[in-house]
Amino acid sequence: MSPRHFSVRGFNAVVPASDSAWQAEIPAHLKRRDPRIWHMAYVAAARLLKNAAEPPRSMAVGTALGALDETKNFLDGIFKDGFGSPKNFIASVHNSMAGKLALEFKIDGPNLTLCDGQNSFASAVASCTLFPSSAFTCLVVAVDESIPLVNELIPHLPPVCAAHLSDSGQEAAVALLLDRRVIPELPSIRAIGPIALAGKEPSALAKELAARLHNGAASSISPIEKCRSFVSAPLQIYERLTSKQTGILIIPSYSPSSKACAAVEVSL
């Protein structure tokens, strides 16, 4: 079965490296209590939904490592005091961010969090095929943050792990509003995978997935090497949507943690 197309009703993002003012958009009640990665996800979603006629009915979040800073703080507490803060623990759980977003934006339908390294965004888009028509529109958020500790740890990791974390300094939150209906005048997106390597090279499997998506249609395929950071795929999608460049772009990804590949296709 061919992966389902979803219409992209809207999109927005927070890229801290190029958006110094984004923190001014965090509500005071969130700024006091919630971790930075939640702030990134909230602002990206709030920008997207600012002019939405009604709140989404479901959501899917893709994140590779979740709230890294909260995980660090929880482990610091155990190391220094013998116990970790319950607040840090709750925030460090990957799907707690999706729950918080659902409460803030009054999303009372299905709520999924997908965690598979570089495939997390593709997994989130693909998971929308599980939702019934009554669960649309769907808010999809891809988000990962960077903390200094990761760069400090890289020299002490095995070479394979270090190689796949070397681009983890890139951070962003990208939000999409998807409709199950195919609306011709809107961009569309779909995803395939993740699919296990099963002895194949990542580049070979990525080409197979791309071929299954475009099925002979003229398309541009992003090199899998371009998708090394956890937010590479959603950022490439966001840049394509922002540029309004017409045509089909396929972005394959490979997650060394699951030894699987996925691919996302956007059409304008």
Could you say what each language-model-derived stretch is?
Residues 125:
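Short-chain dehydrogenase/reductase
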Residues 1-122, 130-136, 142-268:
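Conserved "HGTGT" condensation-loop signature of ketosynthase/thiolase-family condensing enzymes
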